[in-house]
Amino acid sequence: MTGNLVTKNSLTPDVRNGIDFKIADLSLADFGRKELRIAEHEMPGLMSLRREYAEVQPLKGARISGSLHMTVQTAVLIETLTALGAEVRWASCNIFSTQDHAAAAVVVGPHGTPDEPKGVPVFAWKGETLEEYWWAAEQMLTWPDPDKPANMILDDGGDATMLVLRGMQYEKAGVVPPAEEDDPAEWKIFLNLLRTRFETDKDKWTKIAESVKGVTEETTTGVLRLYQFAAAGDLAFPAINVNDSVTKSKFDNKYGTRHSLIDGINRGTDALIGGKKVLICGYGDVGKGCAEAMKGQGARVSVTEIDPINALQAMMEGFDVVTVEEAIGDADIVVTATGNKDIIMLEHIKAMKDHAILGNIGHFDNEIDMAGLERSGATRVNVKPQVDLWTFGDTGRSIIVLSEGRLLNLGNATGHPSFVMSNSFANQTIAQIELWTKNDEYDNEVYRLPKHLDEKVARIHVEALGGHLTKLTKEQAEYLGVDVEGPYKPDHYRY
């Protein structure tokens, strides 16, 4: 037997050759391995770290629970972590972002077969329900030996961290609070999972929290959660904010989005972008990548912003700065990229053009009022996976919604390209090494990687692209007040 097809009613882990997992189809492993080998060539940061640390094995003893999009690029990250000595369990951080062949390749491993896998436990498949998503998250955090729980977390969006910290908080309170009637459906599912587990294990999450040495967080939304936990005094372990490393936020967030937004819209709709009116909600690093991508396709781009500095940047690049209410009725394509909630509400959706395209590229699905749309009485026709046509009976107008309001670049396409993810994942690997090997130097606060490590990641990728850096003379370095080998900029420098 080589397949392992997931069905809705099969939420128990599969076990083969001592590895527990739940993925779509193990027989996809060979395809996944071929793509993984190509990705390795495009990810010089991770491959350089493998070579640098192969003998030292700095992550030996680390049991990393990872919650991050289960893509081909993430597969290279996972196998980098294991190459440096870590044990790993994995789940995706989004119900639509898993690439099933990548998940299969990771479970089978480079030296296994579908019948005899020798890789890493993965609990992820494309098209999970929310119940399945949170089940998979719990499996990722539940190690086989209860005396050896997870001792590191690698997170994207903060769901794994939230599961542990909220679980511990409710265990200490002795009760999981009831959901309110108007709570989002996902929050109700989350609380139900914790309540069910509390009935059988009163201190599961407390034990995990006490074991974890630290968390490294990939994205803007997850970092916001970390700072909120820290401000409330609820952060139980040190955290490194990988997102705000320059070689992450200024590259993955902007240049990765510039590539993958167009890919997602093209695969989802095949609509011509040139000449169309496009509204980008938010002009942070992700929004800048979106606006630049659309402009490059010949679209007429407008931007919404709350921050006057970002708004002025947008205008200096030639974009109109408008409100949603001003622009929604004329827009052919609307993309949310704010990291905030309640950006495009039902009244906005109803005001959109017939067959306008609506999508989100922020981490969560609450930027677009999908719950309101579902309650509105509009009819939904699924055109193909992650593409839905919603039609309002009173007006007859239809709206094309991508990936149910979740990340369209991962739901409708394959996410950011390998080279830019090499920057981000090199930072993740370095951050894991930093927290694991120097844990006594960190308090339960949120930190950023030091500048010299950011520059190290950049240097690797400049060389991979054939660039040649100018070297300071000793006299020049003294004049600038820096070391010849860097760091070259103060921490407050904005690039």
From Swiss-Prot:
Pfam families: AdoHcyase (PF05221), AdoHcyase_NAD (PF00670). One of its GO terms (biological process) is L-homocysteine biosynthetic process. May play a key role in the regulation of the intracellular concentration of adenosylhomocysteine. Its cofactor is NAD(+). NAD(+) binds at residues 219-221, 253, 282-287, 305, 340, 361-363, 409. Substrate binds at T71, D156, E218, K248, D252. HAMAP family: AdoHcyase (MF_00563). CDD domains: SAHH. GO terms for cellular component: cytosol. The lineage of its organism: Bacteria, Bacillati, Actinomycetota, Actinomycetes, Mycobacteriales. One of its GO terms (molecular function) is adenosylhomocysteinase activity. Its EC number is 3.13.2.1. InterPro entries: Adenosylhomocyst_ase-like_sf (IPR042172), Adenosylhomocysteinase-like (IPR000043), Ado_hCys_hydrolase_NAD-bd (IPR015878), NAD(P)-bd_dom_sf (IPR036291), S-Ado-L-homoCys_hydrolase_CS (IPR020082). It catalyses: S-adenosyl-L-homocysteine + H2O = L-homocysteine + adenosine. SUPFAM superfamilies: Formate/glycerate dehydrogenase catalytic domain-like, NAD(P)-binding Rossmann-fold domains. Its main location: cytoplasm. Keywords: Cytoplasm, Hydrolase, NAD, One-carbon metabolism. The gene is ahcY. Belongs to the adenosylhomocysteinase family. It is found in: Cytoplasm. This is Adenosylhomocysteinase. Binds 1 NAD(+) per subunit. Pathway: Amino-acid biosynthesis; L-homocysteine biosynthesis; L-homocysteine from S-adenosyl-L-homocysteine: step 1/1.
